[in-house]
Amino acid sequence: GLYAELIQNRDFEYDPSDREGDKNWNSTHSWKLEGDNATFTINTSDPVHPNNPHYAVLNIQQPGAVLTNAGFDGIALQAGEKYDFSLFGRIPAGHKSNKLQVRLIDSNGTVQGEASITVSSRSWKTYKTVLTAKTAADTHLELQLQSVGEVELDMISLFPQNTFKGRKNGLRADLAQTLADIHPRFVRFPGGCVAHGDGLKNIYQWKNTIGPLEARKSARNLWGYHQSMGLGYYEYFQFCEDIGAEPLPVLAAGVPCQNSACHGDLRGGQQGGIPMSE
């Protein structure tokens, strides 16, 4: 999509309700543990933020196991390009700091990008590093603890530095430029049906789409997938400014799209208007 994030289900917030009860669409979707003497579980007891309650717990009894993410049908790299990797990490009581090797591996098993971070904090902390792509390749992400132990992880992100206008948490340079080349007079966002949702609890709440990424409240949408809200109102307004288009934000009127409310609940709610001066 337009949002440049390369890791799928980075926040471990996928839920079966996103896709009409599909049990495979859950907090571990797109993640896979490979190797023996290791466990990968999901916890909610003390999250980074209440709006982002699920996080991963990786326990290694013998070095060698890797936690992988396939991205969105792969992670396409461009030769020589740099990619920002980040995550929230924490060491639980009873365990020591641990080095986490971060690799991007192609279908032949060749390492196309590599870096490492050392998770050492007892409380949630952001860790960052940069990977450089050796060649143009279709890859997947591998995370490997270098020592026996346990770490807790959340908001695992991989972003190309080459986003549209170089914006952090930005848009894909190619797709955004294609839109810019049309020279639109205005941009309507986030949409129509997606704004109304299918009931009061699923209305697009713009205030949940701004601020720190870990504090944004994700949601399902009518199209049967998950919205991380990484691309939120701030990013839409920023894009409009970057291409010289008039922003046309959409606020739900409180009536579900095409009478699609759950259990016949057609009651809606009003959102506070956005001060355009801000």
Give the predicted meaning of each segment.
Residues 1-229, 241, 246-250, 261-274:
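Extracellular and organelle-lumenal recognition/adhesion modules and their flexible linkers in secreted
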Residues 175-176, 233-237, 278:
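Generic structural signal for well-ordered alpha-helices
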Residues 254-256:
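Conserved radical SAM core fold
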